[in-house]
Regions:
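Rossmann-fold NAD(P)-dependent oxidoreductase module
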Residues: 13-17, 104, 181
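Mid/C-terminal beta-alpha module of Rossmann-like enzyme folds, strongest
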Residues: 158-220
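N-terminal Rossmann NAD(P)H-binding glycine-rich loop of SDR-like oxidoreductase domains
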Residues: 1-21
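NAD(P)-dependent short-chain dehydrogenase/reductase
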Residues: 106-154, 160
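NAD(P)H-binding glycine-rich loop region in Rossmannoid oxidoreductase-like domains
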Residues: 30-73, 83-89
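Conserved beta-strand elements of the Class I
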Residues: 1-3, 79, 112-114
């Protein structure tokens, strides 16, 4: 028996691959304990950083709801799709709350933590690639940031990993290089005085060239 927790973009990709018996979200997760599961795939809570930072208590409550329900549920294996922010920005509400869920996963005898960076996918609704494609919020892009990326269509290659913890990341890519390559018309309109986030998690699973090819596919 297979369960998936989550209803976001990553969860939808997991569902397509593992074909779960049941899918749970915040409204029906109390039913999780009604069944003994072989594997629970957790792609929750929401990956919306802005919402999590604006609603830290609600975000924290969502995390603890997952932990508390899993604590009274029988299962053999737990696979958590987490965020690189737990390593790079653990002092933010978003990073701290997801780190709490990682810490729970680490207490389990059979678990994997798969940390994902910024995502490339046709259905993304907010990141710098979405902003470039839709010509919105370009003035909010921080060209001083260095991010790592993952093409979510490749998730199937990682779902069945046996690593206890793994960062699924590309080589670090400076945001201004992405702007220069794909939106050169705004390169001189950006604010270069702000300090940017610097992501450099290892190992690197994808090269800069592979990521640029995925970005090009997304934008064109």
């Amino acid at each position: 028996m297979i369960a998936v927790i989550g209803n976001g973009l990553v969860a939808q990709q997991v569902i397509e691959v593992v074909k779960p018996n049941s899918v749970f979200n915040s409204s029906n997760i109390p039913e999780l304990s009604n069944t003994a599961w072989d594997t629970i795939y957790c792609a929750a809570p929401s990956g919306n950083r802005i919402w999590a930072q604006q609603n830290p208590n609600a975000d924290r409550s969502n995390v603890w709801q997952i932990i508390n329900e899993c604590a009274v549920t029988k299962f053999r294996r737990f696979v958590l799709f987490s965020s690189g922010d737990t390593q790079v920005k653990p002092n933010t509400d978003y990073g701290r709350n997801r780190l709490q869920l990682e810490n729970y996963a680490k207490t389990l005898p059979d678990s994997s933590i798969i940390r994902l960076p910024s995502l490339i996918h046709a259905s993304i609704t907010k990141n710098i690639l979405y902003d470039i494609k839709n010509n919105c919020w370009l003035d909010k892009i921080n060209p001083q940031s260095t991010l790592q990326w993952f093409d979510l269509t490749c998730l199937q290659s990682w779902i069945y990993t046996q690593h206890r913890e793994i960062n699924v990341c590309s080589e670090p890519i400076e945001t201004q290089d992405i702007i220069r390559e794909f939106a050169p018309h705004v390169i001189n309109e950006l604010d270069y005085t702000r300090q940017g986030d610097k992501y450099n998690l290892s190992p690197y699973s994808y090269t800069r060239e592979e990521i640029f090819a995925s970005i090009k596919d997304y934008l064109t």
